Amino acid sequence: MTQGPRYIRHFHDWIAATESPSTSTEMQWTDTMSGMISLPLLTIMQIVQYFQYLETREITHSQFVEEIRIGGAQGYCGGLLPAAAIAASRNEDEVVHNAGIALRLALAIGAYAELGDDENIPGPTTVVLRTKYSGQAEEIVSKFPGTYISAITDPETISIVGPVNVVEELRAYAEGQGIKATKLHLRGKVHNPENKDLCKEFINLCHKYPSMLMLPTAASLQTSLRSNKTGKELRSSATTASLSIEVLENTLANKCEWYNLLNGMAKDLDAISRTEKEHTFALFGTGRKNCVPTMPFEEKQLRISKLDIVTYVEKHDIPREGRTLDQYPENAIAIVGAGCRLPGANSIDELWEILSAGSSRVEKLRSSRFDLSTVSRGSVGPDAKQTAKRELYGNFLDDVESFDSNFFGISPREAMYMDPQQRLLLETAYEALDGSGYLRTHRRGDFDNVGCFIGASYTEYLENTSSYNPTAYTATGTIRAFQSGRISYHFGWSGPSEVIDTACSASLVAVNRACKAIQSGECPMALAGGVNIITGVNNYFDLGKAGFLSTTGQCKPFDETADGYCRADGVGLVALKSLRQAVADGNNVMGVIMGVGTNQGGLSPAITVPYYRAQISLFKNVLNQSGLKSGQISYVEAHGTGTQVGDPIEISSVREVFGGSDRSEFVNMGSLKANVGHSETAAGIGSLMKVLAMLKHGKIPPLAGFKSLNPKIPALEPDYLRIPTELQDWNSSFRAACVNSYGAAGSNSALICGEAPIVTAMTDVLPTDTNMHETSHLQYPLFLSATNNFTLKANASKLAQYVLKNQPRVADVAYTLYHRRKHHRVQWTGLAHDLESLVRSLDKIEEGLEVPASPKSVVLAFSGQSKQTIGLDPSWYVSFPRLRHYIDLCNKIVIRLGYSTILPAVFATDPVEDVVALQCGTFAFQYACAKCWIDSGLEVKAAVGHSFGELTAMAVTETLSLEDALHLVAARATLVQTKWGSERGTMLAIEATLDTTRQIITVVNENIEIACYNGQKSHVLVGTERSIGQVEHLIATDNRFKGTRNTRVKTSHGFHSVFTEPILPELDEIAQKLEFNAPSIPLETSTEKPINEGEHAVEPSRIVQHTRTPVYFGDAISRLEERLGPCIWLEAGSDSPIIPMVKRATHNPSQHTFLGLKAKDIARPIDVIPQASLTLWQEGMSVSCFDGFYSHPPNGVTSNVFNHIWLPPYQFQRTRHWLQYMDLVTEERKTVDERLRSAGAVGTIASQPQTPPLKLVTARSRDSESWSSLEFAIHSETSRFTDIVSAHAVRDQPLCPASMYMECVVMAAQMVEPSVSVKSLSFQNLSFQGALGINYNRDVSLLMEGDGEYLAWNFTVRSTGKESKGRPTTHAKGRFSVTSHIDFQLYERMLADRMNEILVHPQSERLMAGRAYTLFSRVVNYAESLRGISEITILNNRHAVAEVCRPKVSVSSSESTAVAVCDTVTLDTFIQVVGLLINSSETCPVDEVFIATGIDSIIMQDCDFSDPQHDTWKVYAMATTRSESHVAGDMFVFTKDGKLIFTGSGVQFSRFPIAKLEKVLEGIGMNSAPRSPIGNDGIGKGVTAPPSPTTQFHMNGHAKSTPNRHGLRVRTTVEMDEQTLVAQDSVSRRPSALKSAMIRNDSNLGTLGLDSLSKLEFVNQLRAQLGNEISPTQDLSQIADLYNKLFAHSSTTNSRSAHIDHVHKIELDGPSSPTAVNSPVTAGDSQSKLRIRQRILELITENSGESVSTIKDEVSLQDVGIDSLSVIELKESFEDAFSVQFGDWDFGLHLTVRELVDYVVISSNV
């Protein structure tokens, strides 16, 4: 066989090659038909495919074997070798070993089969015939001697083997008979009976070399393997022979009966799994996937599918090369953080949901931005008709009107005048920086050199602000330069801050500018991106007129139907830094900018047309910077606006640089604009966000809406360009994309963004947590923080959703939350070991803790030797690498010093007899724990040790080096072991005073010493065994000492006594040789007097003293307590008595935190460390066991152990700050129309009597163009309304329940869309304002304004008097929407067990209906028609489970169409449960009640209240106390079968005194005839801005004149709605809200906050300002007393008080409906100054953001945050509110609140 050695050499060279062989060389030998090549290659290929398959599926060999337990691993012909290797292996290692044997067998089989073959004769030795009938193959073979049937694939597919020339003749004959004949790529006589003798010879060879050639026996088979000869299972055979024998005989000499094998398999599958009829074949090999005919299985009615492994692996697992750091350009820039707001997406994660679904966010223009019907521009002139008909489209962000002004320290008033672009930039800047980890250590005062570059152009909000009078905030809020300046100012940066305007390319140009600034050293870090928020209409008109905008809706990039772009909102910012710095800092690198640049298309045919040559040049430039070849760019994110001119030009540029027939893979192209529109100046950054999302998920999304290629664009496929139409894997060896963006003025920008470099991760960090897989139970400390509890819960909820969906590692989540996110004052901590426990913990968060502003001092406490074991739990040593390092380090030093190892001893549970091992081991454990805490970042203020522990403390504080300390401990222990006397000494701890202790010693009269003075009543005695026994006897028998607690100290020797003296001389010699240093941490020695501090605080003599003299531990603790104040006493080590000893020694234990670590006798000792971390966090300490215990030494490379990952951004608590656009021309037209109407030019329609309506709600009017603006009438005279309201009496006043408003809204929505009834119904932000009763003299209206989403409205319920058209009273507001079905299964599973726990809890209290409603009657009296609670079970005043039934007395439902899905009665009974829970709790005093004031969210679905079978529900309610007067409730409603149909979250209750509530309800007049409202005293000139952006609390007062004691008629307010009560009782906790107080005549001055001193000051001020003689000693305890005294004097001295000639309007409303409380400010009005002060505080709050409750009279305006701009605005506000004028010198930052009050009061009386 001359060819044999040559073929083997080919294999050797191929396997050994360090470089790939040339293609021609490889093709030469792999094309050879020789079995010596084909069979080994087949074995290699199939084994490799097998491992690729396992890797792709992320399963193990044993898991796969279990999956194929029935079907097994079967091999056809040569495939039997790898099949046997796999089937006989228990794990991957055995597969590799057996594959090696199979490979040798394959080579040998090929060699034996080719014996005597002439390689010079070309052609195969095997041919496959597709015969026409059974037996035809036998007929043909009989005609050609020397040929044999080698394999039967199926009855008609037969393989024939024979000599080359004979086989060729046979093939020609068969084809002549019309039979298809296929040559096999194989030479050699396989499956040939002529080989029987050769086969025996081969088998003998195998026996000679069993380790190389013998596979395991059939007994080793882990799954089914069948014989190619018989088709039967080999596993069931009795043979003990090697599988190699079976393979050799089948392959060399026997016919392959494959079809029989399949028949046997089908029979067994049918018999074994009769219930499972579907099976899959995983097919490995070269492409002969037709070798598994389905006929045998179909006969058994089995359904077979085939999985081509080659295709499967290629599809799922393209080899990922990745790149190491050194393979990136030297100046590459890392993207380490990102924040975005794009239509429908508030984060990159939400953006991916839109991209992957290929969805579009286009919609018609939102009326909330501006109402086109009110816009005058374009309404006249030649284009008026066209403008009126044109439909405007856009892609909009939600809630741009709102902003978390408190979070950013901006006053509400200033926020209202800020362009929403500035506000959103602040939010996204925070998110990008927080995600990058920058904010974790950021301090504004550091003046960091960080750059800020913003791409922006439009300032459309200027159209809104220009509708109002100018303010000091308008310029700073709308000038473009402040978009970057605002960010830099907020964070206190010194780096360059620039706004860049290049039109649509601006944001990517800003990124280029940032990259260049970092690369040039101008700044080490930068924030870059862009913004575009649509708030004005004029750009729509201008761009539309210029032909830019699509008339049909969304952008359609590259599509035949492209007709222009669709405008969009968008904001995006990325945090950038040098790639090498980012990797060094352990940042989460989201993507790498490998090349970036800009240029200009100055030679374009028109200024708005892109120039292809400029784009080509730019692409080549950035490609060259990246160091990549064009073929390595596999995705291009195009500008792609969807224009007929721009798209073809851009494609041609891409084709020129990145396309070409020589590419090895397609380059996909897309454009974000197809999903979210064209965000103009933010378009480029939006495209970059898309690429970052693609890199994160490793997929390429479809181009949304793409149908057919624009005919102007030549075919893409010839140049390997492709537009994806479905979601696909990004299967490139290195993922890199080009992002392109060009501006309408010719400015181009592009960049290359690649994936992050490979960072080698450490995989042996925690042996118990192999590779950190979440299957382990290692606990991780969780840390979540926010500025308040609302955002804390929102952050937790968002994080839980993300974790459930994305399944990150718990370790990475915990690490990122603590190490890479900013810490806020409200914090929550918890533990989790897996995702389930993580989500469970997050879902349970109710409120956080406010960390102490000044954390306590930390003291490390080291115990003495209190036992004869060390007690290190082995799990600590195994699980905490850094702890292990320090113990190992100590052990190495001990061994180096010549002593035995300490490692067995540290774990021992039995007493350690070797004193050296005991004490060195104790030292090592204490030292390791202390060092780990210090490495964790714990700031230790002092260390103290008891007895032996002081030696460890010396090492930890670096008083002694570690080696010196261990030398001392080991040598000392050796002396103890060798030099100690015969009496070891015994120690006894007693709890007695020093006098009692000394008395005991005197009575015993033995040589007993006090070894330890541990505290005032804690001492340790030392003596001989006999003498200590006498002490114990004395205490037990002598009545003087009986009851004195005592216990033996389990120490090896009696230290601090005369027993130590034999070792002292040599110990002193040792000490003198040690080097003592000044401690790096203050060391408090346990001495009677403190050791003088100095360069060497501890002298060598201390060592002998320490051993011989007593331990004055109590004195040391007292000194520390006096010096440091409240402390955290932390044990160094575990399971020692040190912390209880410290606690007993402190004078005031309640001031301290005692943190002892108990690991013994608990189920999970390793939980002690993360639990201790939580305690330290709760105390405000900055400490991380990630850096300490969990990390590897010496530098704690946690970045390679715990990954900094992307997590959902901070959830802001936004409130509305918005100036609505007003067209001044339109407003003027309205004024003219009103004047004409007043002059009689417009007739009036006489009121006609109306017949009672048939329905509760009827349509009244709607917008002429759409259903976006609707008005309905709510008919309060219907029987349904009156019956329900009459049944719902709050303190005997019939009031409309909240659920009635909801039913009316749903009924109205049904008129718009009948399908509302089968959808999920959602109510948000319900607020209840003016109460609504039964009053037939009032018109009740329902207004519904569309908010831009389909079937979503903002609604208002209000009423006006029928006779007088005064100001309407608002009763309720909220948002209603119809949504798709929501999956409640998670809630159902979570709450089912919780409800059962409450029902069976021993502390639960169960109330039946009668008792429940009796309790409730103090708040609400319910008639039978509203009594649905049959029983309720309450636990701890916080949880309740109630059974609710349909009330027995029914209410008419014929007047409503919404009863089935939103029944007022049923919903009210649900809400009653949470109301009863809250009002029956101990937090509600008997003279006060909790009233519902709003609901955050209600979701209902699958409700059918009209079905008689649905008459019982189970309601779970829980209450959370927000403050003393504010409680929030949540409720969940389940059907009888456990289905969740209703959720209500954030039901807000506020507490009111019953007397006050009754007086208010009596005064509101909603159940009686209305009074005439007060009109405004003056008419404003022009249009003024809203006075406040705060929450609106109305005092809709009807005024009446009442005589005072002087006969004067004074105007007083008698009607107040419920929201006024909220303002008084709960709003004081809202920094931006009103702080108005109800001051009644019977109000006590003390309750108003006036103590004896302030009352004296108050009276003196009144006397000085009003000229009244009021004695400070007079009893003026109530307002009435003060009022009477004032008027008694003023009736004779102040004639002006008899005239109401100066009325001040004090505005208490927000922007939507200014309402005035008209109060005469005169010297005779006793309450005027208080009202003026209150209003002054409100104005200061509006302009500073400071809470009213924190503003004191003596503070200046500057002290409360008023700056040079806001003082101008504040001055104008004062002048408007109080009708006074200030000179410039009168109003400045120096003024105090008291001075302002005095000024206004004096001015008012002039």
From Swiss-Prot:
Non-reducing polyketide synthase; part of the gene cluster that mediates the biosynthesis of mitorubrinol and mitorubrinic acid, two virulence factors that improve T.marneffei intracellular survival in macrophages. The two polyketide synthases pks12 and pks11 are probably responsible for sequential use in the biosynthesis of mitorubrinol and mitorubrinic acid. The first part of the biosynthesis is probably catalyzed by pks12, which synthesized orsellinic acid. This tetraketide is then used as a starter unit for pks11, which possesses a SAT domain, in the second part of the biosynthesis. Its EC number is 2.3.1.-. Keywords: Methyltransferase, Multifunctional enzyme, Phosphopantetheine, Phosphoprotein, Transferase, Virulence. Residues 30-191 form the Starter acyltransferase (SAT) domain. This is Non-reducing polyketide synthase pks12. Disruption phenotype: Leads to the loss of the yellow composed of mitorubrinic acid and mitorubrinol. Increases the survival of mice challenged with T.marneffei and decreases decrease survival of T.marneffei in both J774 and THP1 macrophages. GO terms for biological process: fatty acid biosynthetic process; methylation; secondary metabolite biosynthetic process. CDD domains: PKS (cd00833). The active site is at 504 (for beta-ketoacyl synthase activity), 639 (for beta-ketoacyl synthase activity), 678 (for beta-ketoacyl synthase activity), 947 (for acyl/malonyl transferase activity), 1288 (proton acceptor), 1468 (proton donor). Residues 1249-1558 are annotated as: Product template (PT) domain. Its cofactor is pantetheine 4'-phosphate. Residues 860-1156 are annotated as: Malonyl-CoA:ACP transacylase (MAT) domain. The modification O-(pantetheine 4'-phosphoryl)serine is found at residue 1764. Residues 1249-1558 form the PKS/mFAS DH domain. It comes from the Eukaryota. The gene is pks12. Pfam families: Acyl_transf_1, CurL-like_PKS_C, ketoacyl-synt, Ketoacyl-synt_C, PP-binding, PS-DH, SAT. Pathway: Secondary metabolite biosynthesis. It comes from Talaromyces marneffei (strain ATCC 18224 / CBS 334.59 / QM 7333).
